Amino acid sequence: HLDQLPFPQPTHFSKEDSRFVRPRVLELVFTSEDVRAFATDLGWEGGPFAWDPQRRFFIQCELDAFYARLYGLTREEWLFVLDPAEIHGEKYPGESFRVLKEKEISRYGEFRTKRVCLELFDEMERCAAARCSYVSPLEPFLCTLDEAIGDNVGAGDR
């Protein structure tokens, strides 16, 4: 009963969505020959990607912001997911990313993941409102999978 799982069904993805997600997921996952079969399934014949922590961080934030929008979250709801204490105060009983928040504040002087995820969410929202495509500062991606995007993509036409 996949309908009960908390993620969008493949039919919910448009070809544009797939073009956004697939190269990012491939680059995050395919960093070793151990997962060659996964890369091949996506249509990638090149080698594994280098482990670049800054690039990986940004790709993860792009995906997080993309999925927050795909789920239909408002900015305030997305902020609540990232840092409920900012909305409800420091005594709010639950935080999803408290340990990450503390580590990043200690290391960077800010909750960097929250800031970048919100900035990307805002930029994606601006692009959607202007009816233009979000362009990543990482473009062009190291891999292009357009040729591999076809029948495996969901039938959604969002």
What is each model feature region?
Residues 1-158:
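S-adenosyl-L-methionine
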